[in-house]
Every structure is written in structure tokens, then in C-alpha cells.
């Protein structure tokens, strides 16, 4: 049996995750946001650029799933997610903090609009990615790409801060 969710509940989860991450980010100085070491050589800024790069894919992925197709593979020339993440880090590490922060905010608004445009029925329809044998409801992918991703990186930042 497929686990379902009400659209309003998913939107609340997404907005709550966003607010929690933003609250954490707002509590940090520019120096804290740009100092390496959060996870390996990544700074808070690098984590934010990483989240943004993956989040930017979500609207197109949602449209693919709704159309009944698995989304195109992101950067298929790389064999592992770690290789993709390293590539993204190298692409964004020299971007200025204000640019990364603005890109994150814009990306979130686009992702939220994409989620808002999906019907509750579609959110609860099983879908799968290209390399997966099992399917899950669309809302689970959205939850993972936004809520769980924010939580994962927020926790890394908190551990680094010692809080």
C-alpha cells in the first residue's frame, strides 16, 4: 500500500524545512558562512550552493514524473553521486556569498512553485527514477530533495558549529 500525504501537509513540511534552514543561516556571520571545514573542505556557502544545484533540478524532474517518464539523469558522465557533488563544488566554490544566497532563495521559490502546481493525486502517484527498480510516491522524492536535504546539511552545519 502506498503511503499518501495531503498536499497541504507536504507544503507545510517544505516551508518548515526552509524556515529552519534560513533561521540557521541567519544566525551565522559572513565569516562563518565562508570558512571551510563544515564537511571536508566545504563551507556553509558551499553546502548552500550544493543544495541549490540539486534543488534547481526539481521542477523539471517533477514535470517528467507527472508525464510518466523518469527524469533525465543529472550529469550522466559521472558514475557516482560523490563525483557529481565534487564537480558541483568545483563549479561553485569561487562564487561570492551574496550570489550563492540569492540563487538559493530563487531556487527555493521555483521549487516551491513546482510543488504547489502538483495535484494531490499526482503527489501520491508512485514514480521512479531512471536507475531505481522500486517506485515511491512522488511526494517522497520531493520530501527527500527539499526537506531531507535541508535537514542533512543543516545538521552538518550544526555539528561543525558544535550546537
Enumerate the language-model features and the residues they cover.
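Acidic/histidine-rich alpha-helical segments that form the ligand environment
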Residues: 13, 83-124
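A short, mixed-charge helix-start or loop-turn motif at secondary-structure junctions
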Residues: 3-7, 90-94, 135-139
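Surface-exposed helix-capping loop/turn segments at secondary-structure junctions
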Residues: 26-33, 116-124, 163
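Short, flexible active-site loop motifs that bind/organize anionic cofactors or intermediates
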Residues: 23, 37, 90, 113, ...
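Hydrophobic alpha-helical core bundles mediating ligand binding, dimerization, or RNAP-core interactions
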Residues: 14, 18-21, 25, 58, ...
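Short, contiguous alpha-helical
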Residues: 34-83, 124-163
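Extreme N-terminal tail/first-helix region
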Residues: 1-20
Amino acid at each position: 500500500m502506498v503511503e499518501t500525504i495531503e498536499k497541504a501537509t507536504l507544503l507545510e513540511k517544505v516551508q518548515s524545512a526552509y524556515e529552519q534552514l534560513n533561521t540557521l543561516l541567519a544566525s551565522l556571520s559572513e565569516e562563518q558562512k565562508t570558512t571551510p571545514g563544515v564537511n571536508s573542505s566545504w563551507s556553509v556557502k558551499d553546502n548552500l550552493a550544493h543544495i541549490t544545484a540539486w534543488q534547481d533540478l526539481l521542477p523539471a524532474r517533477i514535470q517528467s514524473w507527472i508525464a510518466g517518464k523518469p527524469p533525465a539523469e543529472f550529469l550522466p558522465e559521472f558514475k557516482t553521486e560523490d563525483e557529481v557533488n565534487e564537480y558541483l563544488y568545483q563549479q561553485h566554490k569561487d562564487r561570492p556569498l551574496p550570489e550563492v544566497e540569492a540563487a538559493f532563495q530563487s531556487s527555493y521559490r521555483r521549487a516551491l512553485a513546482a510543488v504547489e502546481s502538483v495535484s494531490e493525486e499526482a503527489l501520491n502517484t508512485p514514480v521512479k527514477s531512471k536507475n531505481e527498480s522500486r517506485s515511491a510516491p512522488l511526494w517522497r522524492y520531493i520530501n527527500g530533495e527539499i526537506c531531507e536535504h535541508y535537514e542533512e546539511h543543516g545538521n552538518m552545519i550544526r555539528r561543525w558549529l558544535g550546537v
